[in-house]
Amino acid sequence: MPFDTPPSVEQVIVTAARLPPAAAEAAFSAVHLSESDLAKSQRVDEAVGQVPGVSLFRRTSSLSANPTTQGISLRAIAPSGAGRTLVTLDGVPLNDPFGGWVIWSQLAPESLTGIDIVRGAGAGPYGAGALTGVIGLKERDAGIAADVSVGNLGSERASAAAVSTLGRFEFFGAASYDKSDGYVPVRGPAQGAADTRTDLEAKSISGRVDMATGLGLLSLRGGFFEEDRGAGLAGARANASGNVFSATLVQAPRGAALGWKLQAWRRTSDLFNSSVAVAADRSSTTPANSQDKTPATGWGLNGALRQKLGGVEWELGADARLNDGEERERYSYMAGAYTRNRVTGGKTSVVGAYADGSWTTGPWLVAGGLRLDHWETTDGFRVERNALTGAVLLDQRPADRDGEVVSGRLGVTRDLGQDTTARIAGYTGFRPASLNELYRPFRVGNDVTEANAGLKPERLQGLEAGVSRKGDKGLIEATAFWNRIEDPIVNVTLGAGPGTFPIGGFIPAGGVLRQRQNAGTIDAIGLEGRAERKVGAVTLSSALSATDARVDGGSDAPQLTGKRPAQAPIWSATAGLSAELSEKLTLASDLTWEGKRFEDDLNSRVLDPAWRLDARLDWRVRPLVTAYVAGDNLLDANIQTSRTADGVAGYSAPRIVRVGLRLAI
């Protein structure tokens, strides 16, 4: 599928509450997904997953991924359930205040006008969380889009978004509903009565009012979402919900006049997540723990000043993010009842300031930025009680911690003529541990992972160089990069069941005990490239990502030295074709291939290489209405997503075929 280059940095017209693209962004590795790119996907994470090296923690989309594994990472350096990428909607972070993951069902592709993906640590205006890059979503500011479809596996989907103008007011509204009966992840002889469907029901609604004022454009936005899903095991389910409110005031820079932005937001979320232990023959499950509630609240403020004077553009800004949350859980299931209760949580905050700018002279663009951030982890606690008597069994109050991080970026781009550009860039970034990583232990089947309140922020250093050429009939570009993550947060294996451990308690046969730890460093070298060519009515596209990431566990985790990070493939590639078969008929297809992954930190559980073919046929029945038939994993390939300690593999969705109607105005 073709991707656009980032929007022209000279664009200054603002029809939504966001500053125009900064000139500095052209010096870094960026991909833009247009509205037409998004129209082919049912879910936002599937749309961004078209870019090689961009993926959720596992090889599953949000159709079947547990909320706690919907974190997204770029470049396959070290995928994480919490995600190592900052995801924003017009500047407001979408990352969950408790876990750092993103509940992708809160937004439908129809509600967006485009997505900008910037790979490499996001210093400058982005700050904490943008360790491997930034995914910037842009909400629709014109037109109407609606989509209705049905398919096998009980798939039903309806989504609509519209913008209307009345005087100096602009109104935006969006709603979506997505339902699936799901599929059973475990297949073949290994499947037992314990294995059930990953059913899904998700809904969201959002609205926005933009108003022109004497100070600038004022935007008020609110949104709500909820999803309920099965985890593929009898008795294991998850329910995630939340809402967000934001206020933004923007004055776009015009000519040499000063532009600025002020933004405030508040996000709340909650998560129910139940886990089970699986019998050795997979004939049954037993309740293991019930994470009944995870109430969390995130607040944020940011502001920026920007001005362009000739070839110089500068921006000064500051931002603050505060998260407060806890988990309430029942666990230790014995004799038909949970015997222990646990409440754990705390607060995190990051406050930072930055200076960012660029200088354009002739064929040269020089861009750079510097940030200073102060992070804090405070008021942490973990209290465990006897469920029957209320007696306190454990009361931990880890000491408050804080620190400062300086990060920056520098990039140089030169126009070589004949539509060819070369660039080089360096950057640093950091990501503090989420409340989930600090305080919440979790269980998947028979595998238990313990929390760690002493986790330090992850830090990344990187260098990259690239060259690109774009013409009327196509483009080609390539980037080579080196990244190092210091103190990466890794799920480190401590032992295997059956057995009882000082932390984690009893681990059954076929399970392992892990703990989140800062494990040395991860070094990654890689190459990413893409090409596109238009031949008459046919557009051919391809993309490649090769990332060799290796762990050096040092003295803390020497058993990891030389291993690849869990869920990090070396190779991934896509090939796409889009053809206008007639004035009304269009065919699009994408072939995706990925090399093997490892399920675990010790690289003992191998996930085989995987490929899938997707295709879609569109027929324009009216000027504004399109009927389509689409197939995901059209050849029904077996795509491994997980593997247990006793060798049982889980798989991604089988073939899904759907038919639908789309309205676009």
Residue locations for each model-derived region?
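Extracytoplasmic beta-strand/coil segments of soluble accessory domains associated
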Residues: D45-V92, D96
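Short acidic/polar hinge/loop motifs at secondary-structure boundaries
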Residues: V92-R119
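Outer membrane beta-barrel strand-and-loop segments of large Gram-negative receptors
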Residues: T198, S290, T294, G298-A304, ...
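N-terminal periplasmic "start-of-domain" segments of outer-membrane beta-barrel proteins
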Residues: E10-S41, N66-G71
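Gram-negative outer-membrane beta-barrel transporters
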Residues: T360-V366, H374, L475-I476, F481-I485, ...
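Flexible loop and strand-edge segments within Gram-negative outer membrane beta-barrel domains
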Residues: S180-V186, T196-A202, L215-W260, T268-A296, ...
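Surface-exposed extracellular loop regions of Gram-negative outer-membrane beta-barrel proteins
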Residues: T268-F272, D324-Y333, E376-V392, D400, ...
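Periplasmic-side early beta-strands and strand-to-turn transitions of outer-membrane beta-barrels
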Residues: A123-G124, G136, G143-A145, S149, ...
